[in-house]
């Protein structure tokens, strides 16, 4: 059991439906601590760079268009095995396949508009946190 940091992004569909507080409650009730959080509109360039690993995938352009369609909430989460724990509380990518009680099952609307993104590995968490946050923005 290792203390880890992970990255989370509450997506535009959840922001538009005023679900930030409810999603934060799910994260905190699961044992994750929010140590950094900010709201912003991603530029097309930021979105393309952030999702660069998906550039060759057929959904890349619609993903960039969606993620820039409204504000997002960027977060750094801390906790014991935070990456795995966050993935568990988020649920399956497709809300129709997610377990009851997960963020995506309870708030997601579609595979793309599934309310939340979370890092899938330690390398991804490091890259994603550093993409959006300076060390001085992470408050223990």
From Swiss-Prot:
<dbReference type="InterPro" id="IPR034907">
    <property type="entry name" value="NDK-like_dom"/>
</dbReference>
<keyword id="KW-0418">Kinase</keyword>
<feature type="binding site">
    <location>
        <position position="104"/>
    </location>
    <ligand>
        <name>ATP</name>
    </ligand>
</feature>
<comment type="function">
    <text>Major role in the synthesis of nucleoside triphosphates other than ATP. The ATP gamma phosphate is transferred to the NDP beta phosphate via a ping-pong mechanism, using a phosphorylated active-site intermediate.</text>
</comment>
<dbReference type="GO" id="GO:0006228">
    <property type="term" value="P:UTP biosynthetic process"/>
</dbReference>
<keyword id="KW-0479">Metal-binding</keyword>
<dbReference type="GO" id="GO:0004550">
    <property type="term" value="F:nucleoside diphosphate kinase activity"/>
</dbReference>
<feature type="binding site">
    <location>
        <position position="114"/>
    </location>
    <ligand>
        <name>ATP</name>
    </ligand>
</feature>
<dbReference type="GO" id="GO:0006241">
    <property type="term" value="P:CTP biosynthetic process"/>
</dbReference>
<keyword id="KW-0546">Nucleotide metabolism</keyword>
<dbReference type="InterPro" id="IPR036850">
    <property type="entry name" value="NDK-like_dom_sf"/>
</dbReference>
<keyword id="KW-0963">Cytoplasm</keyword>
<dbReference type="GO" id="GO:0005524">
    <property type="term" value="F:ATP binding"/>
</dbReference>
<keyword id="KW-0460">Magnesium</keyword>
<dbReference type="InterPro" id="IPR001564">
    <property type="entry name" value="Nucleoside_diP_kinase"/>
</dbReference>
<comment type="similarity">
    <text>Belongs to the NDK family.</text>
</comment>
<feature type="binding site">
    <location>
        <position position="11"/>
    </location>
    <ligand>
        <name>ATP</name>
    </ligand>
</feature>
<keyword id="KW-0547">Nucleotide-binding</keyword>
<dbReference type="GO" id="GO:0006183">
    <property type="term" value="P:GTP biosynthetic process"/>
</dbReference>
<dbReference type="Pfam" id="PF00334">
    <property type="entry name" value="NDK"/>
</dbReference>
<keyword id="KW-0597">Phosphoprotein</keyword>
<feature type="binding site">
    <location>
        <position position="59"/>
    </location>
    <ligand>
        <name>ATP</name>
    </ligand>
</feature>
<dbReference type="GO" id="GO:0046872">
    <property type="term" value="F:metal ion binding"/>
</dbReference>
<feature type="binding site">
    <location>
        <position position="87"/>
    </location>
    <ligand>
        <name>ATP</name>
    </ligand>
</feature>
<keyword id="KW-0067">ATP-binding</keyword>
<feature type="active site" description="Pros-phosphohistidine intermediate">
    <location>
        <position position="117"/>
    </location>
</feature>
<dbReference type="GO" id="GO:0005737">
    <property type="term" value="C:cytoplasm"/>
</dbReference>
<keyword id="KW-0808">Transferase</keyword>
<feature type="binding site">
    <location>
        <position position="93"/>
    </location>
    <ligand>
        <name>ATP</name>
    </ligand>
</feature>
<protein>
    <recommendedName>
        <fullName>Nucleoside diphosphate kinase</fullName>
        <ecNumber>2.7.4.6</ecNumber>
    </recommendedName>
</protein>
<comment type="subunit">
    <text>Homotetramer.</text>
</comment>
